[in-house]
Amino acid sequence: MSQQNRRVQQNTAAFPLLTAHDILECLAALDIPAQMEDLTKPTAQSTQSIYGSLLEVLMGASINSIEGPKQALLGMMEYKVLSFRSMKRTQINLSRQEMYSDTLQFMMFFKHCRRLALLCGIPDFAISDLARPDANRLRKVLSGIMNFAKFRDERMQTQARFQENLQKHQKKAVDLRRKTEELETQFQEITARNAAERPQSEQAQKRNELLKSELLELNSQRLKEVQEYEELKKERQTLLEQVNHNNRIVTQLELQIGSAKSRLVQSPDRIKRHISEMSFAIQSEKAKLASFQQKARELTNRLEVIGALEVDLRGLIDLEHSIQDQRAKTEEAKRSKSALEARLEGRQIESQGLAAKLEQLQRQLQNASHKLARQEETRKGMRERGARRIDELKAEYKVRARERGEWQKQRDDLLAEQKELESEMAAFVTKHENEINEFLHAYWTMRRQAEDYMNTMTVKLGLQVQL
């Protein structure tokens, strides 16, 4: 019964059965030594050797990798023997352990082979396939494994590309995390430095506001002083002109007095009176000159004070410029801080996006593996449906071929009728072409006359036609 089930499953396999020659070529391509007798007349030793090489090539599980777990299990068995049996029966238990060693190794080897067979679409792999191999059975199992190997080679490039992209994204995520940590460290340092410099900044800002208000007051006072200075300068110029004019008058009077003294005195009383008047005028002019000189000295002192104020004002203006420079630097530092915060947020968002993309790629990889398994499951059904569909299409094709012959005859008849109708239409058109041209000429003449009549009536009636 089991052999019949195996034959049915062999006939409905989800993969094509290869010939022994093709299987030998595939094994040679995988660097697995095998001969034709190993496939036509298999033995347990040759079959296990081929399966062991396939496990090592396709799954990376060699015989040496089975040795470690086997020794661990045997050690557990030895621990149980020494725990629940007396120490006198140690040699008997050790002989049992040696007896179990080969059986345990064979069962572990069978488990790996069965896992490979399940992956290749062979669910009925049994111990008899290793202990008592059959040529047809071995050919079926190796055909499934070779199909799996070919499919694996075809999909290895895609898997390697996904793996490479995954490694790149992981590396990029690590770099972004490192950069994010550096930016967070810089941000914390800047925040701490700003917090430490905040009292000084507030004091400097208050001092700047006080200096600014004082500077505004001094600037307004400077404008007033400059205006007053200009007025005093004009007044000083006017007084200097008056002093020069009076000096010229005094010089002329002295010259006149000298010339008068050199003359003969004919009227002493009049001359004395005139001299006393001139002496009084000279004294008054000297008093004016002394007052002008005192006023000029006062103006000079005020000009010196104004010059000192102007120097102080220039110093305050320079201080204002330096304050503005410091304020600009502070604003620039604030802008750089905002830019660093924005960059930090951008890096965090980018890191989150890359992490989400990495998770998405992992989900895509899992979905691709699940999809591959589903495709392997559905491929068998698709093959059966395809075979049934091919048979149905063949039957339908035969029916359609018969119908096609009938339709071909009808088509030929219709083509002959079409040619006759076309010849009749051509003869009719050539016969009545002159009449059609006359009808068209009369139609266009009547249409132009009607349009002229409508335009004339519109103009005479004063109608406005909106188009």
Curated annotation (Swiss-Prot):
Origin species: Cryptococcus neoformans var. neoformans serotype D (strain B-3501A)
Keywords: Cell cycle, Cell division, Centromere, Chromosome, Coiled coil, Kinetochore, Mitosis, Nucleus
Record localization: Nucleus; Chromosome, Centromere, Kinetochore
Coiled-coil intervals: 159-249, 282-431
One Pfam family named in its UniProt record: Nuf2_DHR10-like
GO MF terms held by the record: microtubule binding; protein-containing complex binding
Gene name of the record: NUF2
Physiological role: Acts as a component of the essential kinetochore-associated NDC80 complex, which is required for chromosome segregation and spindle checkpoint activity.
Name the UniProt record assigns to this protein: Probable kinetochore protein NUF2
Subunit structure: Component of the NDC80 complex, which consists of at least NDC80, NUF2 and SPC25.
GO cellular component, one term: nucleus
Annotated signal sequence range: none
Similarity remark: Belongs to the NUF2 family.
Principal localisation: nucleus
Keyword Phosphoprotein applies: no
